[in-house]
């Protein structure tokens, strides 16, 4: 019986060829990804040389690719310290933004709430006189499906929130009514 755990020389050769082809494909891919840049660099240099020869310029500088400078250990140490300082600054900025963001959202929520209350008041105040009387209240309640509500009941509802006893609810009283109903 043959031991299947041993690799035959043919299978080893197949693996080596496969790895060689894979390596070649990676080299070609690296070259092809940088090819457009090299193509552009070659033709831009050729154009610069051609125009300098045509214009009789002697010292023409060609664009070159700069080499990457690897920092020494002292530079790395400094940059690590700088990174720590940046992280500390960013944490402080984050905390500040969170606090200001919460305040902004609360203010925005209050503003939106006020706009919603104004719009609700406008819906109740059909004749736009700045007051909600018992007739307007009855009409809106009937639109909302409360048809069984009588004029007398509407008058009682208005009377509960009518602080100045004029028989109508003004915007200030309406805001208080809304605040009481949500608290």
From Swiss-Prot:
A molecular function (GO) term: calcium ion binding
Sequence ranges assigned to domain EF-hand in this UniProt record: 112-147, 149-183
Binding site for Ca(2+) 2: 162, 164, 166, 168, 173
Chain's gene name: CML47
Keyword Calcium: yes
SUPFAM superfamilies tied to this protein: EF-hand (SSF47473)
Protein name, as recorded: Probable calcium-binding protein CML47
Top-level division of the source organism's lineage: Eukaryota
Function comment: Potential calcium sensor.
Keyword Metal-binding: yes
InterPro entries to which the protein is assigned, alphabetical: EF-hand-dom_pair (IPR011992), EF_Hand_1_Ca_BS (IPR018247), EF_hand_dom (IPR002048), EF_hand_pair_protein_CML-like (IPR039647)
Residues annotated as binding Ca(2+) 1: 125, 127, 129, 136
Keywords assigned by UniProt, alphabetized: Calcium, Metal-binding, Repeat
């Amino acid at each position: 019986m043959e031991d299947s755990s041993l690799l035959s020389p043919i299978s080893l050769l197949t693996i080596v060829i496969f790895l060689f082809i894979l390596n070649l494909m990676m080299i070609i891919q690296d070259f092809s990804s940088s090819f457009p840049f090299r193509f552009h660099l070659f033709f831009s240099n050729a154009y610069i040389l051609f125009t300098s020869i045509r214009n009789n310029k002697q010292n023409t500088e060609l664009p070159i690719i700069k080499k990457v400078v690897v920092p020494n250990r002292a530079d790395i140490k400094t940059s690590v310290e700088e990174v720590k300082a940046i992280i500390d600054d960013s944490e402080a900025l984050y905390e500040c933004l969170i606090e200001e963001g919460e305040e902004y959202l609360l203010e925005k929520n209050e503003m939106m709430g006020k706009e919603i209350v104004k719009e609700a008041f406008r819906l109740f105040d059909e004749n736009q006189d700045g007051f909600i009387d018992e007739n307007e209240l009855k009409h809106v309640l009937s639109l909302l499906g409360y048809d069984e509500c009588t004029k007398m009941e509407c008058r009682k509802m208005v009377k509960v929130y009518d602080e100045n006893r004029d028989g109508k609810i003004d915007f200030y009283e309406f805001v208080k009514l809304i605040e009481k109903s949500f608290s």
